[in-house]
């Protein structure tokens, strides 16, 4: 169905669910799975999945990038456990929605699979969710997982 799939991961439960769906789709076509993380400043301390722990509000950019590297590595490990062999990990920068769409275009991705809510959950109610923005801006298929 899809030969290239991009899944943005932020360490949230929603991203973990999206990764599982992306892996199911990737297994159907032996697709390449691009796992993207975009380190963001958070408005509150947040605990991440995959046993990574918490990100402090005052974490520096380099600390957030280091944690982001752990997030994509754990996501890649989880994807391998689900049978995915073609995996590329990416650390992006900038506005999450724009970066997701840009990376998808740059890599010729056929589908983006993302969680409906991520770590910056409350901000989404005010400025619009990342998944909503990606759905409107992307030129490929977008699958939002709840």
Predicted feature descriptions by range:
Residues 1, 142-146:
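Short hydrophobic/aromatic patches at helix-to-coil boundaries
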Residues 3-55, 82:
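Small/aliphatic-rich secondary-structure junction motif
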Residues 36, 88-92, 143:
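General small-molecule cofactor/ligand-binding pocket signal
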Residues 50-54, 105-107, 130-131:
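Short, hinge-like loop/turn segments at secondary-structure boundaries
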Residues 54-70:
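A short acidic, glycine-rich active-site loop
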Residues 73-112:
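Structural beta-alpha unit
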Residues 111-136:
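Glycine-rich, Arg-bearing micro-motifs that act as flexible, cationic patches
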């Amino acid at each position: 169905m899809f030969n290239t799939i991009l899944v943005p991961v932020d360490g949230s439960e929603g991203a973990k669910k999206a990764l599982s769906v992306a892996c199911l789709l990737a297994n159907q076509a032996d697709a390449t799975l691009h796992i993207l993380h975009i380190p963001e400043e958070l408005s509150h301390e947040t605990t991440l999945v995959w046993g990574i722990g918490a990100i402090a509000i005052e974490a520096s950019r380099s600390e957030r990038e280091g944690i982001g590297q752990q997030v994509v590595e754990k996501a890649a490990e989880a994807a391998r456990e689900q049978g995915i062999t073609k995996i590329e990990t990416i650390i992006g920068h900038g506005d999450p929605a724009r970066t997701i769409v840009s990376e998808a275009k740059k890599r010729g991705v056929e589908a983006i699979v993302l969680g409906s809510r991520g770590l910056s959950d409350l901000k989404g109610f005010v400025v619009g969710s990342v998944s909503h923005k990606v759905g409107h801006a992307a030129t490929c298929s977008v699958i939002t997982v709840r």
